[in-house]
Amino acid sequence: MKLLAVKVECSHELEDGLSFFMQDELDAQGIESRKRSDFVAEGQKHDSSLVELDDIENLPKDLELTAYFNYENADKKELVKKITDKIAEMKGYGLNTGEVSISTKEVADEDWNTAWQKYYHVIDFSRHLAIVPEWEDYHPAFSDQKLIRLDPGLAFGTGGHTTTQLVLLAMERALVKPMSVLDIGTGSGILAIAASKLGASHVLGTDISDEAVTAAKENIALNDVNNINVRKANLLKDIDDKYDLIVANILADILLELIPDLDSHLNKEGKVIFSGIDYLQLPKVEKALAENNFEIKMKMQEGRWIGLLIARKPD
Amino acid sequence: MKLLAVKVECSHELEDGLSFFMQDELDAQGIESRKRSDFVAEGQKHDSSLVELDDIENLPKDLELTAYFNYENADKKELVKKITDKIAEMKGYGLNTGEVSISTKEVADEDWNTAWQKYYHVIDFSRHLAIVPEWEDYHPAFSDQKLIRLDPGLAFGTGGHTTTQLVLLAMERALVKPMSVLDIGTGSGILAIAASKLGASHVLGTDISDEAVTAAKENIALNDVNNINVRKANLLKDIDDKYDLIVANILADILLELIPDLDSHLNKEGKVIFSGIDYLQLPKVEKALAENNFEIKMKMQEGRWIGLLIARKPD
């Protein structure tokens, strides 16, 4: 299979938003991110006098995001236009886009399949959680660290995204007993797997995309867990049960659609975790939560991204 | 020993700030907090039709904070004046003080020693951490939850304060390998104990107060840990070593004093956790961090309180 590679050079401020957009909206098969700051940080880990940044081949000016599309279905001109429009929209939010350039290239799938693996490594997320690519041999510093095995090429949620990480942290806080968990927009299944490893009694992961449902099932099979179900569903519309914990890592506008249906799907003393919220969109999410009788227990922010731990207001 | 009990009735918004003030600045021996919302929440855990709030004796209107002082040393009039001034100051920050009333009462120490215990219970803080009063028999839902044993009457840091909890969460995130940890203003020693239980290689806890140093040592002795030292020190002034992780849960003005000395006490790739910051004071902390070449990796907020996970800026 041939692939179309679309390379966007721009400011690192666009990384999360643009990755999200290209994977979720434009159906990219996979995304590579090369950031100047990663090379700088990597250099600092060694004796810095030995690492000359100028010697690195094609060192990115700031951020280089390369998205891979199925060549047969991809409309090159339209993709470039949509990405250009998205960047203009993000600029409208007040983000610094940097000097933007977009280029395209035709590549053989084989190249990509091996090439992108080198950009995914173990994410030593926290004291008790690490995300480990399927092919990596990893020896945790603490033997009781829980490992989430993932084929990060499969769907959104490689563990590297800030929005995913904010949910992981909030789950470590909230999951103090065996709870039932609903993961809306499960993507790669990473959050469903994490919930199970943390001790959820059972987990349902849902996604509107067939590809995500398949990917989540494949990732779940890589992990030693047996209490996760995955099925196709559009937010809470086809869900009948109630849960102790509902997590949703999707964009703010979709969270807004979800909020009115939360109460009827949440057990007594249930909690909700939201992520995927740009800080500029926080006020409207806060307003909708308050109007629906929810309150924010804890707010987490990394860069522009906000995650929320939410509960019903006390009467 | 006789005690002077000073009871402040006011809005729950003052709870953390006023507790901090009375314990740290006015040297209260202990503080009891009774909040209407706690009784409401407790009622909801049972069949709510059976719990009638009106039946509860002396149900607080909103918040009742009772601080206990050594009767011999306490100047009743001056204490009331200082608390009144503090509340006026907090009102100036924009807090809702509610209807404030302050009353004093003389009590026998024996009454208090038994009375306050009923206000401290297990804090099921997170999936992997719980704070357990010395006298409680606790069976965690997850057998690998790490327990911090505490005599919460001893010094500041009972585990119930938001500011303490934000540090606990940030430590769960940051302590991904055996690190050396410095806990500045250790109080009860709770954060030093947590760091050790999470797998720190060694921990130094410091406090400017002799009472806190004694209390921390007593609490450490309740826990099965052997790599914590505690000593009296004024912030970083008497500290020579460098650490992988520095935590400081103290008020914003004291954090500002600390910031210029951080760099020289932090190992390469070291991290810093700050808590005790009222959100109105965040801008000046952010400014001082930026001026000293630090950046905020993650911001956590609960109510008015902010906690920060901090690292050096990449070059």
Curated annotation (Swiss-Prot), chains A, B:
- What Pfam families would the database entry show? PrmA
Q: Which reaction equation describes what this protein catalyses?
A: L-lysyl-[protein] + 3 S-adenosyl-L-methionine = N(6),N(6),N(6)-trimethyl-L-lysyl-[protein] + 3 S-adenosyl-L-homocysteine + 3 H(+)
Under the heading CDD domains, the entry gives: AdoMet_MTases
- Binding positions for S-adenosyl-L-methionine per the UniProt entry: T164, G185, D207, N249
Instruction: Give this protein's Gene Ontology molecular function annotations.
Output: protein-lysine N-methyltransferase activity
User: Where in or outside the cell is it found?
Assistant: Cytoplasm
- Which family is annotated? Belongs to the methyltransferase superfamily. PrmA family.
Quote the EC number.
2.1.1.-
Keyword vocabulary terms for this entry: Cytoplasm, Methyltransferase, S-adenosyl-L-methionine, Transferase
Gene Ontology CC annotation, any one: cytoplasm
- What protein am I looking at? Ribosomal protein L11 methyltransferase
The organism's place on the tree of life at top rank: Bacteria
Task performed by this protein:
Methylates ribosomal protein L11.
Query: SUPFAM superfamilies per the record?
Result: S-adenosyl-L-methionine-dependent methyltransferases
Biological process terms in GO annotation? methylation
Q: What is its main location?
A: cytoplasm
* NCBIfam families membership: prmA (TIGR00406)
